[in-house]
Amino acid sequence: MPELDKLPMDAVCDYLELHVSKYGINCVNWKDRFPYHPIAIFSIARGEKYLYVNYFVRCNYLRAVNYENNKSVSEDSCVEFFLQLPDSDEYWNFEFNCIGAVNASHRKDRKHPCRLSDDEIATIKRYASCGNKPFNEMEGMFNWSLTIAIPFSLIGLTAFPAEIKGIFYKCASATKMPHYLIWAPIRTENPDFHRPEFFGKICLE
């Protein structure tokens, strides 16, 4: 979808919501301890220079305390995208809270991250319906969306493959209703998103 690269991010959000297939993040792996299940949906597409992901979330608790790069955004109302390119033993993790704050790295396993620099993170375009100012947890009924654009050049590509491995998450570990939703099952005893052996196949529009 090369036309996406020409649009401002708010228009990209609208385009993805209207024209691209949507998928639910519906797997509650650790239901006995973390049963809360907000609605979380994503769509994904590629332009000529960027990979786009759009998230929509409906939840009862909204939190965005972290606002600096590479902080613990998974404590907040958070969505995540992990990807692994063909023939690579590394994977990339991109974690965003609802105001677009980013924790991102590439690595071979959980213990050895190579975190993205501030300059690298600045190349990731974001559009957050909640704005970009931090706030403490609120309780109610909230709908929010986040659209991100990851440049191919950031992950060392000039063009993006039509098929990759990856996984999508919705979490919020420090809210009153902590939860860990997954697009595809992760068969571990405890929540652990850094398990590339459970990544699924992603075909890009």
Task: List each model region and its residues.
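Structural preference for beta-rich elements and adjacent junctions enriched in aromatics
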Residues: M1-E205
